Amino acid sequence: NKPEDEKSKLRSIKIHNIAFDNIEWRRWDANDSLGMITDLNKLMIDGFRIDSLQKKPLKYEFEELSSADITMKMDKGKHKVTIQKAHYDESKQDLLLDSISVIPQYSKADFPTYFDHQVDRITAYSKSIHLLGLTLWDQDSMYLRARKLLMDFQLEVYRDKINPNKKTTLSELPSAILMKFKVLFNVDTLEVNNSFVAYEEKNKKDRDPGRIFFSALNINALNFTNDSSKASNILNVSAMFMDKGNMSVQFMFPFDRNIKYKASGYITPFQLSELNSILKAAVLIEVKSGGLDTLSFQFDYDEKGALGRVNFAYTDLKVNAFKPKNPDKVAIFKTIAINQLIKINKVINADLTGKI
């Protein structure tokens, strides 16, 4: 179709169906290194439309988009992402991603062999990511809006700390990461349901890795966005810590770099021996007995550090300390000294209160 006053310019075009088989797309980063390879077994586009004049940005739409068996090799070969199926329906404003996996390309034992520095080995799976009430355009510019985002995930992170940590820059915080997305987005309601997160680390060759995890994880947020014109994102998180302790935390992620991030919450109650895996791996200490009544905390933080308070209410805490050169043998004198210090602190401060 052509406008009568601009006969030389293409106004719109519509293609009823486009089908692609075995697509490969390669993306190079700013250093001219291959950053990602994406393979699609099949891509189907129905009702594809372009509506544009030279005076305006290119605007394109489609009625439905489906893809199967998507594979993305990324992160410099450390991980592969697969999506079994993706489908977008414009009339329903609905995007559904099925069976999303993040697969490490090397085993836990092989990761240190391929990388001479500390690298997170990530394994993840989501049954589905579902965007409802999805629109892609706002006043001729791309702005992704959704009424609701529903998802679940299982996430395992492993870090071998035997290798040196060669990171020389400060870790980016959530708002900075979100603002790196090329497309602005706003989700009215974010719901993460019945998910799982575990972190495991190996500190010494002669020690077993330590592990902590959070089950029955739920995350809720309203107006979740990467639009820096907004003040912040607020996330409410609940979970079971080590399958035993009830946990509730609220996070505030500001977009203004002059405002600090905030976190506050509590964990109640569980046996402190549940922490033995991570304690022995990190500091060669195991809890012999003792229960946590309540752990509450509130702190502000940024890239450089945190400041806040923690209250640790516990009962009957006794520990064993182990010898560095023989991690399976109890260091008797060190154990006596630590337990005596715990008793003294309990007399001075019935609930251990301190600064973060």
Protein language model regions, located:
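Short, T/G/N/S-enriched strand-turn elements that build extracellular solenoid repeat scaffolds
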Residues: D140-S141
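Extended terminal
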Residues: M252-P254, Y266, S277, V283-I356
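Extended amphipathic, helix-rich lipid-handling scaffolds
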Residues: N1-R27, L43-F48, E63-I70, D94-L136, ...
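Elongated, acidic membrane-bridging lipid-handling scaffolds
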Residues: N1-Q93, S171-Y261
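Hydrophobic residues positioned within well-ordered beta-strands of beta-sheet architectures
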Residues: K127, L235-V237, V249, A263, ...
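Outer-membrane beta-barrel proteins
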Residues: S107, Y158-D160, V319-K323
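Short, surface-exposed beta-strand-loop junctions and turns on beta-sheet-rich folds
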Residues: I103-P104, K205-R207, F255, Y314-D316
